[in-house]
Amino acid sequence: MIQDQANDLLAMKKTFTKSKWKPEEDRILKDYVIQYGDRTWTHVPKRTGLPHNPASCRFRWMNHLKPSLKKGPFTDEEEKRVLQLHAVLGNKWSQMAREFPGRTDNEIKNFWNARRMRLKGKGLPVYPDEVREQAIRTAAQYGVKVELLNAHYSQDSLMAGNVEKPQELNNLALNQCSPYYQSTLANVQPSRNRVMEPETTFPFTGGSAMNEQNPTLLCNPYVESTQEQLPDSHLFGNVTYSSPPMPLIHEVENLELPSFQGFDFHEEPSSFGAEQYNPMLNLEPHNTLVQSPLIGQTPTDFPSSFYDELLDELLESVVNGSLGEIPKTDTSSESQLFQSSLRSHTDATPDIANTTGYVGSNERNTTNDDDWIRLLLDEGFI
């Protein structure tokens, strides 16, 4: 028997259509409900032969064919009553329909949505002030929570576009840190994943050398700046520096080398007799990527070009196998330095000659013309 009912329902579904109701179909449905009542809608399509499903037959009867239905637009009293009930009940359309004989829940919902969209387009509030005040008193009388009413009112006000901007937002500056934000960040431990500090300065730069950052970084609690008077401050002045509180990634504290643009390595000692202060000697590279070698001071008695020219002439004479003219100097200091340089080059020239492959050591020892050391001795340099 259950199988037969299932087959009948399946056969009925195949015959159902989603077409509009015709006047002849409305007449057949109305006569059937008046004769048999509106209790059972499952057998209506089968008994009447209508090509509509039971739900469609019921909806058609309840919203269009029922004799007690009230047709036409809502009156002023009905509209005011809808506003009062909606302010308290919200979107409970079935409960609201009980207060309106002849009006269905679907009709009340359509009326409310159409009115709300119309007022929203004009920028007017959905609830009048007197309706809202009366709804609050009614809610308090029947024990309805006022918070629920305020929620409905604020929601409809937002949908109507009646939102005013607070005055406090007009005076709010960009990137402004509140005291609560600063006090909260002050207790946060610095992260170990920071690559660079917002403020990077180095000592021995003749003042404060820092990387200017965005002013918004002033709210960063990890930046700590201190001013200390270093030894021999008359050479460098006040130096401002900041050290990172925690190691950086891969135990690298800084990715940049210090700059010594303003420091003169050839500066004479001060008149007070103090030893010349070399900042390179006090730098202790620790866990850095590149370590700079120490740079010593070169003597300033002769220019560096003098040694370059002398070395070029000596190398040219060894390679070509002939001795060129060597400039003579009159000063005693120059001759002494020149003699010491020649002695140092006499030890290095045989190796250079052998590596070049032009002049052999045996040929240089047997030939008197190539004995340039003896010629130098004859000239009186040594």
From Swiss-Prot:
Location of this chain's protein in the cell: Nucleus
GO CC aspect terms: nucleus
Ranges of the DNA-binding region feature: 41-65, 93-116
Tree of life domain: Eukaryota
Any one Pfam family match given in the protein's UniProt record, by short name: Myb_DNA-binding
One MF annotation (Gene Ontology) recorded for this entry: DNA binding
Residue ranges constituting the HTH myb-type domain according to the UniProt record: 13-69, 70-120
GO biological process, one term: regulation of DNA-templated transcription
Gene3D superfamilies recorded: Homeodomain-like (1.10.10.60)
Keywords, sorted A to Z: DNA-binding, Nucleus, Repeat, Transcription, Transcription regulation
Annotated segments matching region Disordered: 326-364
Transmembrane segments: none
UniProt feature, compositional bias: Polar residues: 329-343, 352-364
Name listed for the protein in its UniProt record: Transcription factor MYB104
Organism: Arabidopsis thaliana (Mouse-ear cress)
Upper taxonomic lineage: Eukaryota, Viridiplantae, Streptophyta, Embryophyta, Tracheophyta
Underlying gene: MYB104
